[in-house]
A protein has these predicted regions:
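Conserved active-site alpha-helix within GNAT-family acetyltransferase domains
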Residues: 90, 115-133
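Active-site acidic-Proline motif in GNAT/NAT acetyltransferases
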Residues: 80-82, 86, 115-116
């Protein structure tokens, strides 16, 4: 089942995030706090077997005075290896889009992915995402 994450998912989300981004990037407590207080992020999860989660999607809700609409950006997509190839990521992404369309005024979705992640890019293209000519840049701040 695809659904919004709840505070009760914090421990399992910590395990998933450790698989995805590496151990020590966050804690169960910080995830719980974020799920309770972060109104700029929507977290979608897919239920797996035995009380475990199969994956998650994070959507950041960007809003600027320059535009009337929200600009949601999908920033994280992770599916455990044993659930890959079953349409779990596709289902979570579609759920995220449909949920956001119901709640927020918007006309587009943005998505951030690695330039070398061709498998993910293929999925994103298949559900209607396309390169928009924008370039994502970052800078380390010490």
């Amino acid at each position: 089942m695809i659904r919004l994450a709840s505070v009760g998912d914090a421990a399992e989300l910590e395990r998933l995030n450790a698989e995805f981004n590496g151990k020590g990037k966050t804690t169960e407590e910080s995830i719980r706090a974020s799920l309770l207080t972060n109104r700029c992020e929507i977290v979608i999860v897919a239920d797996g077997n035995g009380g475990r989660l199969a994956g998650f999607v994070c959507v950041q809700l960007k809003k600027s005075f320059c535009y009337d609409e929200y600009m949601p950006e999908i920033t994280e997509v992770y599916v455990r290896p044993e659930y890959r190839g079953r349409g779990v990521a596709r289902e979570m992404l579609i759920f995220a889009q449909e949920y956001c369309k119901k709640i927020y005024p918007l006309h587009s979705f943005e998505l951030l992915t690695g330039s070398d992640n061709t498998a993910a890019q293929k999925l994103y293209s298949a559900i209607g995402f396309e390169c928009d000519g924008e370039m994502h840049m970052s800078k380390q701040v010490k």
